[in-house]
């Protein structure tokens, strides 16, 4: 999923030149891939998900909150008419009947964020900046003095990870 483009990073950094420093384009691609992975999303458009059904439940959750449409739904090998359920924009399916106990197979298409949240774009830009400035180093020498500091476990600074966690899918 493309979270930021080179143009977004230029805007974030206030850069006037059309070209970026070497390696920044690769860092942008890597930041997009890493954040997409941390969000629990993938780039596949078509998804097939198996969900356990209970007769007392009518509300079910898809693993992707960006589901745009259900292409096919079956419960215990019986196809369900689209009039019998509703897909909400946050990936929730509400059935209009009590399903039998068993399994619901949902085939759906997913999209990304539309539009991309500005704070998520900011997190991606800050991550590229973090890598570009090599802020991940454990020690720095400033004015003859060496300062040592702890790295984060994930390699992503806490303030960036906090933004990503808001949109993370479990």
Swiss-Prot record:
Pfam families: HCP
Entry's localization field: Virion
InterPro entries: HCP (IPR056472)
Keyword terms, alphabetized: Late protein, Viral capsid assembly, Viral release from host cell, Virion
Biological process (GO), any one: viral capsid assembly
Recorded GO CC terms: virion component
Function: Head completion protein that closes the capsid once the viral DNA has been packaged. Probably part of the head-tail connector by binding to the portal protein and to the tail completion protein.
Protein name: Head completion protein
Organism: Escherichia phage T5
């Amino acid at each position: 999923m493309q979270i930021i483009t080179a143009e977004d990073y230029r805007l974030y950094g206030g850069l006037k030149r059309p070209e970026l420093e070497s390696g920044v384009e690769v860092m942008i691609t890597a930041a997009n891939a890493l954040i997409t992975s941390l969000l629990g999303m993938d780039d596949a458009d078509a998804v097939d998900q198996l969900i356990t059904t209970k007769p007392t439940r009518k509300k079910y959750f898809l693993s992707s909150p960006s589901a745009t449409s259900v292409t096919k739904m079956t419960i215990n090998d019986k196809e369900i008419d689209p009039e019998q359920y509703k897909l909400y924009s946050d990936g929730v399916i509400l059935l209009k009947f009590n399903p039998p106990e068993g399994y619901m197979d949902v085939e759906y298409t997913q999209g990304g964020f539309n539009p991309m949240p500005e704070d998520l774009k900011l997190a991606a830009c800050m991550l590229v900046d973090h890598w570009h400035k090599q802020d991940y180093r454990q020690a720095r020498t400033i004015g003859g003095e060496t300062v040592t500091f702890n790295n984060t476990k994930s390699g992503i600074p806490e303030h960036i990870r906090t933004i990503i966690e808001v949109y993370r899918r479990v």
